[in-house]
Amino acid sequence: MTRLPDRAGGGTGAGSGAGTGSGTGPGGAVRGTVGASASASAASSEDGVPPDLLRRFTTAERWVHRASAALMGVAIVTAAFLYLPALAELVGRRRLLVIVHEWSGVLLPLPLLAGLASKAFRADLDRLNRFATYDWRWLSRAVRRVPGPRVSGKFNAGQKLYASFMAGAVLVMLGTGIVMWFPYLTPLVWRTGSTFVHDWLAIFIGVLVIGHIGMAVRDPDARRALRTGFADRRWARREHPLWEKENPPPGE
């Protein structure tokens, strides 16, 4: 089980102890400590998660994201040095850069395939592949920049579209990249078409990844959930209300 941040458990115990032990003297302090522990245990859910937190990602899911992000980052950076003249002049061993780029692209699907061994990861893939009525409403409000809350489940419509596009784009980039890697296995028209698709799709992916990072920079709670695996319940209620309702606090 993923360990909780120390501040979560400490906050619960401190608040309960202060309320229970005040004005009772030395004996009351002991009773307050015991009461704090009992209150913290009662307030926690069955898996040890405090009521003000929600388990958003397991350890396996977080490592899938980290490995995929690392490989994607290497592929994008090496591509930039290979295709932009200003950066290409800075590289002394271009052939080594080509090899790193090729293998980072080939290995990119592996974290996703390894993640399929995780039940939680498969459940999240199922959520990402479902586009409900409220997702269309979320998308409409986002496109028209309508202010106010937008209803979504664990993943909003934007995240679902991003995940679906990136999954398909990685496969296209892998296929076209292999054609470019082994040019003598295919006719000239295939190589020409693959180069065209690979180059333009790479630019589009780069723009999307930059936008994805920009969204994450503006949302510290989302970053914390990816880093620790736990999301603040207030953030979940505001950004993903349907998912928060599926996981009510203990006792409700």
Protein language model annotation of sequence segments:
Residues 1-13, 17-20, 24-252:
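Membrane-embedded alpha-helical bundles that constitute the cytochrome b-like, heme-associated redox core
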